[in-house]
Design a protein with these regions (language model features):
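Bacterial Sec-dependent N-terminal signal peptides
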Residues: 1-28
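Long, intrinsically disordered, low-complexity segments
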Residues: 18-21, 110-111, 182, 217
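Membrane-proximal, proline-rich intrinsically disordered regions
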Residues: 19-67
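Short, well-structured active-site flanking segments
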Residues: 23-25, 153-163
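Short linear capping/connector segments at secondary-structure termini
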Residues: 28-31, 95-96, 163-169
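Short, surface-exposed recognition loops and adjoining beta-strand edges that mediate ligand/DNA contacts
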Residues: 33, 60-79, 195-208
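Conserved, well-structured interaction surfaces
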Residues: 43-47, 51-56, 82-156, 170-173, ...
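Conserved small/polar residues in nucleotide/adenosyl-binding loops
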Residues: 209-218
Length: 220
């Protein structure tokens, strides 16, 4: 028995010694030190903010919410399976509880987009790589973030507001007026960096014409 305890203690000591090195190889993500080493990678990284736009006009999205609430369309129930827990009826009758799925999906879509823009701006500014289009990427992300925030204040008024990716707490709620004025300044400060004429090389990203269209709607 004594011999068994000695062997067991020896094995435990070996195992404990082997656990002191907690470093690991991560396969599910890319560390910032291993990426953003050239212009191509920074440009590709900015594309993540644009992929968020895909959810705008999907079913049960912010687009659907706005169409329903403005009476531009109506979604009838076709049998019990199409009633969708009454979420469309709630919007049509302007009796919308906080748990309505279109509200939560619209809210999440907006703030996922804002978070992506904040992260990309932070990563781009932090990168030591310098190239001609770097300021343009940052400007595009700021204008796209303004688009998302416009949707937020248009639908909800006062909302949590932050432009700091490193902020760990819950963002402070700001008034619609405060955010509106901030966005107006953000637009004016970044307009000079945007392409004014469409071309094969700038098709898709935020441009001067997009900004003007957004600014017009913003002012309305």
């Amino acid at each position: 028995m004594k011999k068994t305890n000695i062997i067991l203690s020896f094995v435990i000591c070996i195992l404990l010694y082997g656990c002191t090195d907690l470093s690991e190889t991560v396969y599910t993500g890319v560390a910032m030190n291993d990426f953003f080493k050239n212009e191509k990678e920074l440009v590709a990284n900015a594309g993540r903010a644009y992929t968020k736009l895909q959810g705008y006009n999907s079913e049960q999205s912010l687009w659907t919410l706005l169409l329903q609430a403005s009476d531009e369309c109506a979604v009838p129930a076709c049998g019990g399976s199409w009633y969708s827990n009454g979420r469309y009826e709630e919007i049509q009758t302007n009796k919308i509880p906080p748990a309505n799925k279109l509200l939560t999906r619209g809210w999440n879509w907006i703030f996922n987009g804002i978070a992506a823009c904040n992260e990309i701006i932070y990563e781009t500014e932090l990168s030591p790589i310098q190239f001609e289009g770097k300021e343009k990427i940052i400007a595009e992300m700021k204008i796209l973030r303004a688009f998302y925030y416009y949707q937020a204040i248009s639908c909800w008024g006062n909302v949590p507001f932050t432009t700091d990716y490193t902020e760990t707490g819950y963002p402070e709620q700001k008034s619609r007026e405060y955010i509106f004025n901030y966005l107006e300044k953000e637009i004016n400060d970044n307009i000079e960096f945007l392409d004014r004429e469409p071309s094969d090389t700038n098709y898709g990203p935020v441009s001067y014409t997009h900004l003007r269209a957004h600014e017009t709607r913003h002012d309305l």
